[in-house]
């Protein structure tokens, strides 16, 4: 009888762990092949810009504390080079009483080549907060962009096309979910 009960508890714990993990972003997305600078730019733009206007409020929930309201301090999509060439670019800065989060995504092209990059910073506004700063690897999936820290292997930020940021993780392992 004790053996059956033990196996029941073991199976139940496996189910609970599986359910909890299914709510986190996919850790091994299938990359989407982007073939041109325009594809990259459109992908970035749809992730960052649609629901982020300067002055608006966005709310995140960190797993160990109450909701945190951020104000969109800066949001822009595109700039041109000095030669007037269009360069894909998307950037977002959101601030609260406790945090400042900056995300930049950029895609540049020329001479038949394309290049993309990203930068993210999650900085506390007081000394006892966890800070995070890196230039992550960009992974494109069907409807999301994953920013992966190559040093730690963690997905520091996930952006959903047409929505914006849906998930972040700082270097202390705290997860931030958009509400």
Stretches found by the model and what they are:
Residues 15-18:
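C-terminal motif of bacterial Sec signal peptides marking the signal peptidase cleavage site
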Residues 1-2, 20:
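N-terminal hydrophobic targeting signals that begin at the initiator methionine
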Residues 23-179:
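Conserved functional acidic sites
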Residues 2-9:
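Sec-dependent signal peptide recognition
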């Amino acid at each position: 009888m004790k053996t059956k009960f033990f196996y029941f508890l073991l199976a139940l714990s496996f189910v609970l762990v599986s359910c909890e993990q299914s709510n986190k972003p996919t850790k091994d997305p299938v990359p989407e092949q982007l073939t041109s600078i325009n594809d990259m730019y459109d992908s970035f733009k749809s992730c960052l810009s649609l629901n982020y206007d300067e002055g608006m409020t966005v709310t995140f929930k960190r797993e160990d504390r109450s909701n945190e309201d951020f104000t969109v301090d800066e949001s822009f999509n595109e700039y041109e080079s000095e030669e007037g060439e269009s360069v894909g670019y998307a950037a977002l800065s959101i601030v609260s009483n406790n945090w400042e989060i900056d995300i930049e995504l950029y895609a540049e092209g020329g001479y038949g080549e394309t290049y993309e990059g990203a930068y993210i910073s999650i900085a506390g506004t007081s000394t006892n907060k966890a800070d995070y700063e890196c230039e992550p690897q960009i992974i494109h999936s069907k409807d999301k962009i994953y920013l992966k820290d190559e040093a730690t292997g963690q997905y520091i930020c996930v952006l959903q096309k047409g929505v914006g940021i849906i998930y972040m993780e700082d270097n202390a392992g705290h997860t931030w979910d958009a509400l």
